[in-house]
Amino acid sequence: MRWRSLSGHRFFVKSTTMRKHTAVEVAAALVFRNEKLLIARRPSGVHLAGLWEFPGGKREQGESFESCLQREIWEELDCGITVGSLVFKNVHSYSEKTVDIRFYHCKLTQGEPRAIECDALEWITKDQVADYSFPEADVALLEYLDRCPHLWV
């Protein structure tokens, strides 16, 4: 894991072993409220079904990661967000695909999140993270968040 800088912001980059398939680019929202973090459970019938993750999705061609995240949150949660700084980036290879995932600090700006394209939503505290199962691509981020209490406000 190493530090990178982008527009004056520092964030961590974690890279795991790459396999020989094209990376799927993903943007994910870190939405904190009242010392809790929003997570969503992946629906049945999709890759990594039943695991908990951070809301977001695949970036479309020509779309910025920030625009992708705003679109995905409207589609998945029926609410609006402001996308803030990049917090963490990870490239992780699964047997069937590689994901290049970027996690952004976000704020709710319109509506209340609803589980539209996921099985469930939860607001969890830092101490509850271990009670949920997350995809391997999120583990390095979770370790980083454990060391960053200032984000949980």
Where are these regions (language model features)?
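Aromatic (phenylalanine/tyrosine) cluster motif
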Residues: 11-12
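Conserved N-terminal beta-strand and adjoining loop/helix that marks the start
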Residues: 16-37, 58
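Active-site-adjacent beta-strand/loop module that shapes the phosphate/pyrophosphate-binding cleft
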Residues: 80, 89-112, 122, 145
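NUDIX/MutT-family hydrolases
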Residues: 105, 114-145
